[in-house]
């Protein structure tokens, strides 16, 4: 069951990132995150920390709660 949330969260992050037009590499660099780590977040393979969730939200210019919409 937990994996479902990680996958859904990753899909939401990917959807929002793609709306910015940025590649994973450019977005990860912009927020100070390793690209392979960020890729694994989008793939639903990481149980990400709150600090990194906030970095992603700030980079996407959305609220943290927006990242969890429809989960």
Give the ranges of each region predicted by the language model:
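A short, Lys/Arg-rich alpha-helix, primarily the initiator
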Residues: 1-19
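Residue-level signal for the short linker/turn that defines the boundary of a DNA-recognition helix
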Residues: 11, 21-22, 48-51
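Residues within the helices of the helix-turn-helix
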Residues: 14, 25, 54
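Alpha-helical residues within the helix-turn-helix
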Residues: 18, 29, 58
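Short alpha-helical DNA-recognition segment
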Residues: 21-40
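Hydrophobic micro-packing sites on short alpha-helices
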Residues: 53-57, 67-68
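Short C-terminal boundary/hinge segments that cap the last helix of small helical domains
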Residues: 61-71
């Amino acid at each position: 069951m937990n994996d479902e949330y990680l996958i859904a969260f990753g899909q939401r992050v990917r959807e929002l990132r793609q709306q910015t037009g940025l590649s994973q590499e450019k977005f990860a660099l912009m927020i100070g995150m390793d690209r392979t780590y960020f890729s694994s977040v989008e793939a639903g393979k990481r149980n990400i920390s709150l600090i990194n969730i906030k970095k992603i939200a700030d980079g996407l210019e959305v609220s943290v709660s927006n990242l969890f919409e429809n989960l």
